[in-house]
Amino acid sequence: MNSAFSGPSSPTPGPSPPRPPLWPPLDFGLGALACCGACVFTNPLEVVKTRLQLQGELRARGSYRRLYRGVLQALWVVGRTDGLRGLQKGLTAALLYQGLMNGLRLGSYAQMQAAGVTDGPCCSLIAGAAAGALGAFIASPAYLVKTHLQAQTVAAIAVGHQHNHQGMSSALVSIYRREGVCGLWRGVNGAVPRVMVGSATQLATFSSAKDWITHTQWFSPLSSLNTLCAAVMSGVAVSIIMTPFDVISTRLYNQPVDQFKQGRLYCGFVDCLLKVCAAEGVLGLYKGMTPVFVRLAPHTTLSMLLWDVLRQRALPYTH
C-alpha cells in the first residue's frame, strides 16, 4: 500500500522520536480543551445516537414503532419537538465528561508517549487502553447523567426509560440520595470496555497513521494536513470498532433500577450483550451506527487535530 504513494525510494515508515514532555497539568488541560471544543459541535449527534440506541430496546425488529429513522430525520424530530435547545440536551454533562475523561486519557497517553512507552503497535494499543480505562472510570458519573438527560424528552417521542431529571446537578444529587456513591458509578462496567477499545483504537491508529503519512511524504513534514488525514483515519476506525460497545454502554447507563439498587434489565456487560443479541439479533449491537460514525468521525478529527495543534503551539513556551 505504501508504494502507491511513496515509490521505492521513500523512507520506510517508523515511529517518530518522542516529543519532549509538556508540564503534566498543561498536557491534561490541553487534552480536555481539545475534546470539549469538539463536543460543542458534535453533541446534537450524540443526542440522536442515544435515542437510536435505546429505540426498540429488547424487542425484535418490526415489533415496535420506529420514531427515529435516521440521522437527519432524528435531528428534525428532536428539533421540531424539543426545540433547538433539545439538540444540545446534556451538553453540560457532556462537557464535564469530555473534560475529565479525555483530559486524563490524552494527558496520560502523552506522558507515556514522551517516555517512549508507546513505541511499537502493541505498546501503543496497551497504553491507549490503559489511559482510556482510567479516564472512563473517573468520568463515569458524568456519562451516566449525560445519557439520562439526552434520552429524556416528551412522551410523544420518548424511547428507553425516562429518568425526568431537572439538570446535571439535580441528577447527581438525586442519584446519590437514591443509590449512594455506588449509584454514581452504575454502568461503569460497560463504560470501561467501551473506552478501552475506543481509546486504544483511536490513539494507536492516529499515531501510526500520522507516522506513515509523514514518512511517505504526502505533505510537507510540518503541514497540519498530516494531522488532519491521520485524525480522519482514526475516526473511521473508532466508529466501526466501537459501536457495539457503545450500544451496551448506553443500555447499562439508562436502565431503571429496582428497590435493591440493581438494574432491572441487565446485570452486567455480558448479560446485556447476550440479551441484546437474543432479542434484537446481532444487528441490534449496531443500532445507531450511522450517527456513531457521523459523530465520532468529526469528533475524533476535531479533537485529535486540536490536541496536536495545541501541543505543538505550547511546546516552545514550556522548554
UniProtKB/Swiss-Prot annotation:
It is a multi-pass membrane protein. Residues 10-22 have a biased composition (Pro residues). The lineage of its organism: Eukaryota, Metazoa, Chordata, Craniata, Vertebrata. The chain crosses the membrane at residues 25-45, 63-83, 116-138, 188-209, 224-244, 296-319. This is Solute carrier family 25 member 34. Signal peptide: none annotated. It comes from Danio rerio. Residues 1-22 are annotated as: Disordered. It holds the Pfam family Mito_carr. Keywords: Membrane, Mitochondrion, Mitochondrion inner membrane, Repeat, Transmembrane, Transmembrane helix, Transport. Its main location: mitochondrion. Solcar repeats lie at residues 22-115, 119-212, 222-313. The gene is slc25a34. It is found in: Mitochondrion inner membrane. Belongs to the mitochondrial carrier (TC 2.A.29) family. GO terms for cellular component: mitochondrial inner membrane.
